[in-house]
């Protein structure tokens, strides 16, 4: 039976109606600070914790509830003779329900408050009460989420007590709540400047907080269950995780993966760009004067694969672009926005998933990334692989000309474009590019020459006069020979093979320009 509740919350959503229902059941409510004032102002009978413990708040509120009369009332095991004797001897009444949520630490960090102001928002008494109540869940209920108020109030109104199952479920939620809170603190401190750059990027203990955004219909395949979890803080750069879904069917596991691949690839470009993704791999990428032109050119690279694909654009979609998009069956489109005419046209495709990420139209240099957003995490059974995200980029001046002939200005433009694309293709990756669009893509092969052959075989556009990007060096000259045979005139690659001299000799013999970036872009 719930006779007494301690209520102290930062998030006061639904607080007063819930407290009134408790009071109507005759539950004595203990409270502190702002929560106590809010309840008293609403006419809810409330007892100050300071009056209850006969120990007023001290240190400007830093110590309020850290008292044996509070924690003894929460933690004592009902029915255990030794515990009953202890609380009776010390006049400690039972506290049967603890309703607490914690100081808004994450909000303070997100608001960019100074370091010590953020530290001041680290709750001490709240987590202690939550953990005490959760540990004693056999006898005490603990509520950390306003979404549970209705359920708890209804159950108490029906039986004056909480069932074992309800207390257990609330216990799980409470420990998850405090764990997430502590992880957020750890993440914040890890992000502080350190003299050890490696320790800052890869701390001894990695704590990350993700909240369940929802269940998915299934995972990668129907026999695999799936769910989507979102980070506690929205990144400054545009992301799929925080993009706004405007219409369409529920996003699937594969949709989310493909959307992220499309978004990552289109974010490489400051010019008007479009990326078409299929099975997490680009099948067409193009720049254009307008979004409509960029999409039409990207689609033309591999129109068969584009069917049922995912499209990312880095400029708002207008009526002309919408017309092009509606001419093809697509799963998803993500863009910075859509004008009224575009929304009307795309709205006719009821199942088409439209996502909006407004900052996608902004220059990449305008996005800031926190240290945790510079990491890429991949799970393996029993462990986690962590590395820096591949944000490596090169300029013309960073490259070294390997051959007798240097690229022309037009070739340079296409080479740098191909280099931005090839890092998003599964290794071994080869991209043929011409006039700032892909004309042939080959990836996922176990030998580089086979990726070249795949790109040539799949090409729907003229390869003569094209340029080629390779995500890693050519281990043999055979790949370059196949590129020359296809009609390409310039190649960009990392360089560094022991057979570079043979590869360069083959390029020179065909008057093909080749440059080395000194940077590899493997993608597994």
UniProtKB/Swiss-Prot annotation:
Domain of life of the organism encoding this protein: Bacteria
Molecular function, one GO term: IMP cyclohydrolase activity
Lineage of origin: Bacteria, Pseudomonadati, Myxococcota, Myxococcia, Myxococcales
Database matches in Pfam families: AICARFT_IMPCHas (PF01808), MGS (PF02142)
UniProt-listed GO biological process terms: 'de novo' IMP biosynthetic process
Protein name per the record: Bifunctional purine biosynthesis protein PurH
Gene3D superfamilies: 3.40.140.20, Methylglyoxal synthase-like domain
Gene: purH
Family per similarity comment: Belongs to the PurH family.
InterPro entries cross-referenced by the UniProt entry: AICAR_Tfase_dup_dom_sf, Cytidine_deaminase-like, MGS-like_dom, MGS-like_dom_sf, PurH-like
Pathway field: Purine metabolism; IMP biosynthesis via de novo pathway; 5-formamido-1-(5-phospho-D-ribosyl)imidazole-4-carboxamide from 5-amino-1-(5-phospho-D-ribosyl)imidazole-4-carboxamide (10-formyl THF route): step 1/1; Purine metabolism; IMP biosynthesis via de novo pathway; IMP from 5-formamido-1-(5-phospho-D-ribosyl)imidazole-4-carboxamide: step 1/1
EC number in record: 2.1.2.3, 3.5.4.10
Catalytic activity: (6R)-10-formyltetrahydrofolate + 5-amino-1-(5-phospho-beta-D-ribosyl)imidazole-4-carboxamide = 5-formamido-1-(5-phospho-D-ribosyl)imidazole-4-carboxamide + (6S)-5,6,7,8-tetrahydrofolate; IMP + H2O = 5-formamido-1-(5-phospho-D-ribosyl)imidazole-4-carboxamide
Gene Ontology CC terms, in alphabetical order: cytosol
Keyword set, alphabetical order: Hydrolase, Multifunctional enzyme, Purine biosynthesis, Transferase
């Amino acid at each position: 039976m719930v006779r007494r509740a301690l209520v102290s919350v930062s998030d006061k959503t639904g607080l007063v109606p819930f407290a009134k229902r408790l009071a109507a059941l005759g539950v004595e409510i203990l409270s502190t600070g702002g929560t106590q004032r809010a309840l008293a102002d609403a006419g809810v009978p409330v007892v100050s914790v300071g009056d209850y413990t006969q120990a007023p708040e001290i240190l400007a509120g830093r110590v309020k509830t850290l008292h044996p009369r509070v924690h003894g009332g929460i933690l004592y095991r009902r029915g255990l003779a030794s515990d009953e004797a202890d609380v009776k001897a010390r006049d400690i009444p039972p506290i049967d329900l603890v309703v607490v949520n914690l100081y808004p630490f994450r909000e303070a960090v997100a608001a960019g408050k100074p370091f010590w102001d953020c530290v001041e928002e680290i709750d001490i008494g709240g987590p202690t009460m939550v953990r005490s109540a959760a540990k004693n869940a056999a006898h005490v209920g603990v509520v950390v989420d306003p979404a549970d108020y209705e359920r708890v109030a209804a159950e108490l109104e029906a039986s004056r007590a909480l069932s074992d199952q309800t207390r257990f479920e609330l216990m799980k939620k409470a420990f998850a709540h405090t764990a997430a809170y502590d992880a957020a603190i750890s993440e914040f401190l890890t992000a502080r400047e350190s003299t050890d750059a490696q320790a800052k990027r890869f701390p001894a203990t990695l704590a990350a907080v993700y909240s369940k955004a929802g269940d998915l219909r299934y995972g990668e395949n129907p026999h695999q269950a799936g769910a989507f979890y979102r980070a506690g803080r929205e990144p400054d750069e545009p992301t799929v995780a925080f993009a706004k879904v405007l219409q369409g069917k529920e996003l699937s596991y594969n949709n989310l993966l493909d959307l992220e691949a499309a978004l990552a690839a289109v974010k490489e470009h400051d010019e008007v760009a479009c990326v078409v993704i299929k099975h997490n791999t680009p099948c067409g990428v193009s720049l254009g004067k307008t979004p409509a032109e960029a999409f039409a050119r990207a689609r033309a690279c591999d129109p068969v694969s584009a069917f049922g694909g995912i499209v990312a654009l880095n400029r708002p979609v207008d009526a002309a672009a919408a017309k092009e998009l509606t001419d093809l069956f697509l799963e998803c489109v993500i863009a910075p926005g859509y004008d009224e005419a575009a929304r009307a046209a795309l709205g006719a495709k009821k199942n088409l998933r439209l996502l909006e990420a407004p900052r996608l139209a902004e220059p990449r240099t305008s996005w800031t990334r926190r240290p945790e957003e510079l990491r890429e995490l991949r799970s393996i059974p029993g462990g986690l692989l962590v590395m820096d995200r591949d944000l490596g980029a090169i300029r013309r001046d960073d490259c070294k000309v390997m051959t007798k002939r240097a690229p022309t200005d037009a070739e340079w433009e296409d080479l740098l474009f191909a280099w931005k694309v090839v890092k998003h293709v599964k290794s071994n990756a080869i991209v043929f590019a011409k006039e700032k669009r892909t004309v042939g893509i080959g990836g996922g092969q176990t030998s580089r020459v086979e990726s070249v052959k795949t790109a040539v075989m799949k090409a729907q556009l003229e390869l003569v006069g094209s340029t080629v990007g390779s995500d890693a060096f050519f281990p043999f000259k055979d790949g370059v020979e196949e590129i020359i045979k296809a009609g390409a005139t310039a190649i960009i690659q990392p360089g560094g093979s022991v057979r570079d001299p043979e590869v360069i000799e083959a390029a020179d013999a065909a008057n093909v320009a080749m440059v080395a970036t000194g940077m590899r872009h493997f993608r597994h």
